[in-house]
Amino acid sequence: MPLQGVDTQHFLDTCWQRKTTVLRAALADFVCPIDGDDLAGLACEEDVDSRLIVQEGQEWLLRHGPFGDADFGELPADKWTLLVQSVDQWIPEIASLLADFRFIPRWRIDDIMVSYASHGGSVGPHFDQY
């Protein structure tokens, strides 16, 4: 499934590693094979790298997995996000997404991280180290 409405050469020439870019509807035909419960299940596994970020007022709380069912039951109704790294290693349908990004050198792609956020959920101010 090619990226829809994306000129990959233009993206590489003007956007890649230069500016934040949102590719809306680029994967319009993609049907996600997992839901929030599936992602939470992965986050309970010992070998899966996962994080929960919860906003409490002006503070951001970070917790690292693995998590238990009780951890999800104790979450507030809103303002939290679950992040799970390397989902492509666990869900083949997610791994198939990498084919759509073959125009990016493979050595530049680490993994596919999947997030699930409640209403108002975010990762807060942060920077990524790769």
For every predicted segment, state its role.
Residues 1-6, 10-14, 28-32, 40-130:
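Active-site region of the double-stranded beta-helix
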